[in-house]
Amino acid sequence: MPKVPVYNIEGQQIGEIELNDSIFNVPINTHVLHQAVVAHLANRRQGTFAAKTRAEVRGGGRKPWRQKGTGRARQGSIRAPTWRKGGVVFAKKPRDFSIDLPKKVRRLALKCALSSKVKENNLIVLDKWDMNQYRTKEVIRVLKNLGLENEKALIVIPEKNEYLQKSTKNIPEVKTLQVGNLNVFDILKYDKFIILQDAVKKVEEVYA
């Protein structure tokens, strides 16, 4: 089992924690990670765009001028794609872009992402982080104590903490997630992975 240091919010190491091998020490499968990221980005798409073809644009049923004798190029409709206010060629229509990955693949991808953070020494465990007021400066102070003030960091908490979650929203490249919202895309997007000790236990309960 991999062992990682446990820090307090002052940046001092106060102990070590053993991580579950089946979650934090699995072989990295880049193909599965790629599938998970593609699915995540596809599922974020609304797919509500729509444009009209020449058949759907109002008007254009009459031939604008006779076929021959005017000296002008022949035209059949004022709603042809070459005309202003004409229809769109191969117009886009609303569609569902969502990709439903099998549960086993989703879980494996998450384990691979977490394992990659351990292997890269980018996983930081905090013993606790209690906030009872909205203080962005406090979040910046803690990140500075951990030597992460200029890093892209993902903070994972065991349950909702509105003060911490909203305080990090003002900091570019820092995001806070609950364990239930953990996803491969965010784990890979942020360089540093900060997780509270209680959140580690919760992850191991769910995915072990």
From Swiss-Prot:
Residues in the signal sequence: none
A cellular component term from Gene Ontology for this protein is:
ribosome
Alphabetical keyword list: Ribonucleoprotein, Ribosomal protein, RNA-binding, rRNA-binding
Keyword Heme applies: no
MF annotations from Gene Ontology: rRNA binding; structural constituent of ribosome
Q: What is stated as this protein's family in its record?
A: Belongs to the universal ribosomal protein uL4 family.
Protein name, UniProt field = Large ribosomal subunit protein uL4
